[in-house]
Amino acid sequence: YDAVNEKGLGMAGLNFVGNAVYQEIQEGRENVAQFEFIPWILSQCASVEEAKKMLAEMNLVGTVFAPQFPAAQLHWILADQYACITIECVREGLKVYDNPAGVLTNNPPFEQQMFLLNQYMHLSPKQPENHFSEQLPLQTYSRGMGALGLPGDLSSTSRFAKVTFTRAHAVSGDSEAESVSQFFHILGSVDQQRGCCEVAEGKYEITIYTSCWNAQKGIYYYNTYENHQITAVDMHRENL
């Protein structure tokens, strides 16, 4: 569930099962069905700031696309090149959060994801110093020990923490090729491999595809589970 418009505003929906609560239709409000939320925003807004104003007047409802397609329980990340927000429709109503991490995964709610980052505030890309005991001559025995304790499992909270850390410390060159390459390395740190996350007998959750967008040039980059080669599509050259 991801899309981007010609102005460089991008939006993605991620699973929020058990927490998403859509509202009933209200007179006098801009009632928007969950399945049309992304195109409703991207067809009218050029920036996060414009979207915030529209969200204040919107009522997100659970109208289904068709009887066989119930409303997907999602929360959303919305970003341009200057700002990023998270949008959640919960029992208390529509919540809009500034997202300084620039990251979103599935459940739990965004505020809880951000709070859990407090557990990792001691982590660093630098080698650690011995604060355990002045009486013990402790030394590092491997590179990367400053990030010892960074989650590596495939749960959404662990993936949120790991990709937030990776994004915060990843270093890229100035060229577009270097930036795109580094982006795919960042998301690759939380790839899901077939067989490691079983959701039913013989069925596994995998990273089907990974994508990013050059907001200034309108170029969409992606690769897939079966093909790691990065493909570039210049949307301004396509018949849309």
Describe these PLM feature segments.
Residues V17-N19, E92-K95, G102, E226-I230:
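Short, surface-exposed beta-strand-loop junctions and turns on beta-sheet-rich folds
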Residues M11-G13, V96, Y220-N223:
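Short hydrophobic/aromatic-rich beta-strand segments that constitute the beta-sheet cores
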